[in-house]
């Protein structure tokens, strides 16, 4: 009887994954049996990233490592992607989750606040996609999931920089999906609404009630809600889905 060859374990990189939505995504992909590279942007966040990587390895029996890289830097993004690829021997999934906000009305917004958001959210996505594309094209397989936002779809007062960055992510997603589809690489965007994270912890009870009243499901989303969607888009079952922007907002209307 011929011995069955065990399939090689897939490798995934999730940027901005030391906390919040990114953390939930990293855990979800590890639970699905993937080796996962956890990323944070600074040494200050490294202990949390290392703790998550250790938890992933201990709980799910997969390889995991934590790496510091500012994805706004093309050089650091390239090194990050290459390091994940080297560690796992392959790179099947890239989740561009790293993102920041610097909210303010346009009339009062500082140029550096506009640039900072664009650099991380939009340029960072481009940098990581560019680095991963070469690997995935050579493999003739891969999944790229970019984190957009409902704000990138509909806009929002006081978030012109954030909205522009997330709308740009949609543009990159649709363009890159056309470039990579012939090589069996899918590229999709996820557009979350209000999700329970550190960013929403600062909301007052009154603000929470106002937001919840605009959501058909009557509640803010959980990081795991987003992670479950990303896990599906990263799976073999999602091979015929590409170039899509999927809103996960509980039926919210901005």
Feature annotation, model-predicted:
Residues 11, 18-20:
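Conserved glycine-rich cofactor-binding loop
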Residues 129, 165, 173:
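Active-site helix of classical SDR
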